[in-house]
Amino acid sequence: RATSDGGSPSIQSLLPAIYPLLKSEFALDSGQIGLITLTFQITASLLQPMVVMFTDRHPKPWSLAVGMGSTLIGLLLLSRAPSFPVLLMAAALIGTGSAVFHPESSRIARLASGGRHGLAQSIFQVGGNIGSASGPLLAAFIIMPRGQASIAWFALAAMIAIIVLGRIGRWYQLQIPNLRRPAMRAAGRAA
């Protein structure tokens, strides 16, 4: 699980790490770089509570793979973006991937904890922090020397993550009936 949360942040942290490349290739000014950041953050942060309002009532086991799929499309678009508006679309897709991925992945970490919720959340956070730290290093060694098109190599990691997350989603789907039983009992006691 820690590796699945590490994968998402490492891909997301590529975006700010390649700002110098994007600034050079597209002749962007600081305001445009700021708009890329704003676009990513709005979708990654502000969209997430809306996703949670829905998934708290209706768990979506496949949202991990779907979120990573959005990130994958964003990466591919970023690797081939011919213009600033397309860069913004790519940033929005990567941010949307994060917003969709993280609520259910946090819930799955708790579910897989075996009752050790604090430990599970800590491992989840460590995975994310390792991912966030590794993204800029990967960008420095892979993308910066080879250019924008090399971003597509990270799509391979996203595809592998989608397969792994699909398997985790299948496991999670099997757990959902067990989650509903205690909630139904608690609702019965409250009535």
Language-model features, listed with the residues they occupy:
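Cytoplasmic helix-loop-helix junction between adjacent transmembrane helices
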Residues: 90-127
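Helix-loop-helix hairpin linking two adjacent transmembrane segments in secondary transporters
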Residues: 124-171
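Extracytoplasmic
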Residues: 3-20, 28, 51
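Extracellular/periplasmic helix-loop-helix junction of adjacent transmembrane segments
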Residues: 18-45
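Residue-level signature of mid-helix packing/kink "hotspots" within the transmembrane helices
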Residues: 13, 41-49, 132-133
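Conserved MFS/SLC helix-loop-helix module at the cytosolic interface between two early adjacent transmembrane helices
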Residues: 46-84
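Flexible cytoplasmic inter-helical loops of multi-pass small-molecule transporters
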Residues: 167-190
